[in-house]
Swiss-Prot record:
Organism from which the protein derives: Homo sapiens (Human)
Function: Probable UDP-glucose transmembrane transporter involved in UDP-glucose transport from the cytosol to the lumen of synaptic vesicles. It is involved in platelet dense granules maturation. Alternatively, could function as a molecular adapter enhancing the formation of the PI3KC3-C1/AIC/autophagy initiation complex to promote autophagy in dopaminergic neurons. Could also regulate the plasma membrane localization of the D(1A) dopamine receptor/DRD1 and dopamine signaling.
Assembly with partners or alone: Could interact with ATG14, BECN1 and PIK3C3 that form the PI3KC3-C1/AIC/autophagy initiation complex; enhancing the formation of the AIC and promoting autophagy.
Lineage: Eukaryota, Metazoa, Chordata, Craniata, Vertebrata
Composition skew (Gly residues), residue ranges: 339-352
Keyword Oxidoreductase listed: no
Protein name: Solute carrier family 35 member D3
Alphabetical keyword list: Cytoplasmic vesicle, Endoplasmic reticulum, Endosome, Membrane, Sugar transport, Synapse, Transmembrane, Transmembrane helix, Transport
Name of the coding gene: SLC35D3
Membrane topology qualifier: Multi-pass membrane protein
Catalytic activity line of the entry: UDP-alpha-D-glucose(in) = UDP-alpha-D-glucose(out)
PANTHER family tied to this protein: SOLUTE CARRIER FAMILY 35 (PTHR11132)
Length: 416
C-alpha cells in the first residue's frame, strides 16, 4: 500500500512539473520571438540539446547518475525516439513563430486524440475506456471551436502546427513503447537522445546560418533578453526530461493531457502579455469545452486507477490468508457423508470402526481432541468457499493462453 501511494505521488509530481516547465517554456519563447524579434530558433534547439548532452556526460563520468556509456547498441534502441524528438522540437519552434500563443495552445489541445489513435495502432493495448474516449472527443471539439475564432495566423504556422501535433503524438507513443521494450529509464533515454541529436543540430544551425548571424543580433546588449535566452535553454532541458519521465511513469495520453491542463494558464498569459489575438466568444466557448474535457479525463483516470488498485488488493489477499494459517490447522474441514445403505450398513460400519472414525473426526476438527460443533463446520465451509473463489480468481488473472497444435492433439493413433 505504501509503494502504491509513493507511485501515485511520483506520477502526479512529475506530471505537474512537466506542465510547469512546458508552459513556462512556451511563454518565454513566444516572448523572445514577439518582443525581441529573435528568429534564431535552430540555435536555441542546438544549445538545448548540447547542454543536456554535456551535463549528463559530466554527471555520468563523476558517478553521480547511473547511466550506461553511449554506444551503437544503445543508440539503436532510441534511434526512432531521437529522430522524432528533434523533428518535434523544430516544428514546435516554427509553429510558435507563425501562430499566436493561444492559437498554438489550441493546436496542442488536439494532441490527446492523435496520441490515443496512434497508441491504439502502435501499442495494440486495446481500446480506451468510455470515460477516456469521451474526454478526448470533448477536448478535441473544444479545440476546434476555439480555433474557429482565430483564423488570422500565418498559413505556414498552421501547417507546422498540424505537423507538430502529429509528430509530437508519435514521439510520445514511441517513448511509451521504448519504456516497455528496453530496461533503461528516462534519464538514459534523454542522455542518448541528446548525444545523438547534438551533431545533427550543430550542422543544421550552421546550414541555416543561425550560428553565424546570431552574433550580430543587437538584443544581446539587453540583460533581460540574455536572461530569458538562458532560461529557455535550461527550462528546455528540464522539460525534455519531465516529458520522458511522465510518459514512462504514466502514459502517452496522460502526458498529452497535462499539456491541455497547463494550457489554461498559457492562454491567459498569452492574451494579457501579447496583443496578437482578441478573446472572441467562440474562442472562450472552445476553452470552456476544452477545460470540461480535461476534468472528465482526470475523473476517468482516477476511476481506472482505483479499480486497478482494487484488483491488485483482491489478488494479494489470498497470499496473506495463506501466511496466517498455522501448520496444524487445515484450510477447511472434511465432513463425513451420511450413509446410503440403511441402518444395517450403518451399524456394520460402527461395529467395524466406530471408535476409530470418531477419533479421526476429533483430530481433524481440533488438535486438542475436542469434538466439532455445527458452528465450526459452517465457518470452515464458508472459508473453504472463499479460498476456492480467490484461488480461481488468481488462476484467471495469471492465465497465459498458449497456442496448441490441434493437428497433433486430434490425431488418432492406431491401436496396437
Amino acid at each position: 500500500m505504501r509503494q502504491l501511494c509513493r507511485g501515485r505521488v511520483l506520477g502526479i509530481s512529475v506530471a505537474i512539473a512537466h506542465g510547469v516547465f512546458s508552459g513556462s517554456l512556451n511563454i518565454l519563447l513566444k516572448f523572445l520571438i514577439s518582443r525581441y524579434q529573435f528568429s534564431f530558433l535552430t540555435l536555441v534547439q542546438c544549445l538545448t540539446s548540447s547542454t543536456a548532452a554535456l551535463s549528463l556526460e559530466l554527471l555520468r563520468r563523476l558517478g553521480l547518475i547511473a547511466v550506461p556509456p553511449f554506444g551503437l547498441s544503445l543508440a539503436r534502441s532510441f534511434a526512432g525516439v531521437a529522430v522524432l524528438s528533434t523533428l518535434q522540437s523544430s516544428l514546435t519552434l516554427w509553429s510558435l513563430r507563425g501562430l499566436s500563443l493561444p492559437m498554438y495552445v489550441v493546436f496542442k489541445r488536439c494532441l490527446p486524440l492523435v496520441t490515443m489513435l496512434i497508441g491504439v495502432l502502435v501499442l495494440k493495448n486495446g481500446a480506451p475506456s468510455p470515460g477516456v474516449l469521451a474526454a478526448v472527443l470533448i477536448t478535441t471539439c473544444g479545440a476546434a471551436l476555439a480555433g474557429a475564432g482565430d483564423l488570422t495566423g500565418d498559413p505556414i504556422g498552421y501547417v507546422t502546427g498540424v505537423l507538430a501535433v502529429l509528430v509530437h503524438a508519435a514521439y510520445l507513443v514511441l517513448i511509451q513503447k521504448a519504456s516497455a521494450d528496453t530496461e533503461h529509464g528516462p534519464l538514459t533515454a534523454q542522455y542518448v537522445i541528446a548525444v545523438s541529436a547534438t551533431p545533427l543540430l550543430v550542422i543544421c544551425s550552421f546550414a541555416s546560418t543561425d550560428s553565424i548571424h546570431a552574433w550580430t543580433f543587437p538584443g544581446w546588449k539587453d540583460p533581460a533578453m540574455v536572461c530569458i535566452f538562458v532560461a529557455c535553454i535550461l527550462i528546455g532541458c528540464a522539460m525534455n526530461f519531465t516529458t520522458l519521465h511522465c510518459t514512462y511513469i504514466n502514459s502517452a495520453v496522460t502526458t498529452s493531457f497535462v499539456g491541455v491542463v497547463k494550457s489554461i494558464a498559457t492562454i491567459t498569459v498569452g492574451m494579457v502579455a501579447f496583443s496578437d489575438v482578441e478573446p472572441t466568444s467562440l474562442f472562450i466557448a472552445g476553452v470552456v469545452v476544452n477545460t470540461l474535457g480535461s476534468i472528465i479525463y482526470c475523473v476517468a483516470k482516477f476511476m481506472e486507477t482505483r479499480k486497478q488498485s482494487n484488483y491488485e488488493d483482491l489478488e494479494a489477499q489470498p497470499r496473506g490468508e495463506e501466511a496466517q494459517l498455522s501448520g496444524d490447522q487445515l484450510p477447511f474441514v472434511m465432513e463425513e457423508l451420511p450413509g446410503e445403505g440403511g441402518n444395517g450398513r450403518s451399524e456394520g460400519g460402527e461395529a467395524a470402526g466406530g471408535p476409530a472414525q470418531e477419533s479421526r473426526q476429533e483430530v481433524r476438527g481440533s488438535p486438542r481432541g475436542v469434538p466439532l460443533v455445527a458452528g465450526s463446520s459452517e465457518e470452515g465451509s464458508r472459508r473453504s468457499l472463499k479460498d476456492a473463489y480467490l484461488e480461481v480468481w488468481r488462476l484467471v488473472r495469471g492465465t497465459r493462453y498458449m497456442k496448441k497444435d490441434y493437428l497433433i492433439e486430434n490425431e488418432e493413433l492406431p491401436s496396437p
